[in-house]
Amino acid sequence: MTMLINYDSGTLIVTALDMELPTLSTGPIVFTGVGKIRAATALARYLAENEQIRRVINYGTAGGIKGVVKGKLYPVNRFIESDFRSCSVNLPNKVMIEVPTWLDNTEHLCCSTQDHFVTDPTELDDVLYGNQVNLVDMESYALAYVCQQFGVDFHCYKYVSDDANETAPGEWIENVSSGEDQFIDLLLSHYRYSHRHSPR
């Protein structure tokens, strides 16, 4: 168990599944469940009941599409609602959310969110999205939208667990918890977290 102290009561960690952060013990953390509806509902409920939260840090796994390496953690600041791709009406303001970058001298990426596991990257509409998608997941757009509605800062980090192809389900199962150490290191280096030392 990795025990951290959170010195900022206004910061909340959000992820879909506890198996993505199996050893991290700190507070507060919300495990939303998989998919946009579960993610949005769980986060909105928590923010409504805890008005002190001013920043949400989302961590989760994602499939790699372009410009990423499997096994690495990336900051994401652009989020696409992929399930609008078949809509015949142009809805640009509803399709993408962009939040300010927060890490200096670091490229922040673009993630496409949909309610199914992507095993064929050709299904993504590169024409609509301007060929800018780096990653795919199932929650981040919904979380970014909720934070936008509540006026809360949203910092998102995605660990590339698979290549969003026919081998993705097996790769995800194998790698779902592999990014935890990188995320913990990031919390310690960029946020107000520190190790909790056991009393002697």
Describe these PLM feature segments.
Residues 15:
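Internal glycine-rich, Lys/Arg-flanked active-site/core loops of soluble domains
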Residues 2-12, 54:
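Extreme N-terminal starter segment of soluble prokaryotic enzymes
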Residues 1-2, 198:
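N-terminal amphipathic/basic-hydrophobic helices that include classical n-h-c signal peptides
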Residues 18-200:
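Glycine-rich phosphate- or other oxyanion-binding loops that anchor nucleotides, phosphorylated ligands
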